Amino acid sequence: MALMLDEEMDENVTTIKVIGVGGGGGNAVNRMVSDGLQGVEFIAMNTDQQALAKNHAATKVQLGSKLTKGRGAGADPEIGQRAAEESKDEIANALKGSQMVFITAGMGGGTGTGAAPVVAEVAHDLGILTVGIVTKPFSFEGKRKMGLAEQGIANLLMHVDSLIVIPNERLKMISQEKITLMNAFQAADNVLRQGVESISALINVPAFINLDFADVRSIMKDAGYAHMGVGSAKGAGKAENAAKAAISSPLLETSIAGAHGVIINITSSPDIGLEDVETAAGLITQSAHPDANIIWGTAFDENLSDEMRVTVVATGFDNKAADGLRNSLNNAAGTGASTPSAVFSSDVSGAGAAKQQPAAAANSAAKPVEEESSDNRYYDELLAILNKRK
């Protein structure tokens, strides 16, 4: 009987995979592996063979080996996109068996910007709940890189269920004191790590008031832009402080104001007072839309002592841009027409939707990529820029 129970529990465990695409996404995966994050599987995908070899992920997928010869995308999102399209079968094989995936990438470069939307498309077509968490460049990196990033985000939004965007510019807001470049990027990665860790625990760890994968899916499926925050606090006012930290992170462009779908999870010691739970949940509920679908759960952790931890996932914002992209996608599907992945324009003057250039893509398909990868030189270049400004 016990064996049957164990088998049933194994079947009910939701498989969650975290996919780092390109240099920035690969670095985020490396940090999570080093932090010992449990309950998820890690996959690294890159055009750069050397960077992939150094990655700590258990599963690795080289994108576009025929196209790039393992040299990277040369900071060209179109190359990144074509490389991922070449490797769609390998991507699908790596994703099989998962119910939920997080796709993380740095937007504005080559592989992450171009390949992440293709990876998301494959995942979504497999029926996997697909969540994107990406970063946007610093303002000093220039309009062209920002324009490519905005294009990449628009393309990604078409294929994910939920999308969380972290502007690097906001990394300067995490401390009043001088912050190192390494600490800044770690702070961005922490948003991903805490979110993945919290959602994995929500779904797979038994709790006093339990949430399951169906709850998470009901909030995050086909939701567009999303907010995911984790707050913790101790002592007097911990409920209010933890809730406020969860609903308004300085690193995100979003808050939960106007959200139509909200997941609340409160973790604390078993002796938590009802008043604290009511304070935290009430503050979050008041910040969302009056008719929001609120799903909440609570778990006990003896190790937290006086600490309360609040996790919030919010979706269903009134966003015309997101709705427009999704309507275009749905209209194409409704007419029976296939919706091609957006092709990147090499002439980007600002943010905007991706321009369709099938002819240009076809003409360049036969050309091998000779550029050395700049995805992983990105951080060296960034350090050089910062050093010049000292």
Where are each of the predicted segments found?
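Tubulin/FtsZ superfamily GTPase core signature
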Residues: M1-K390
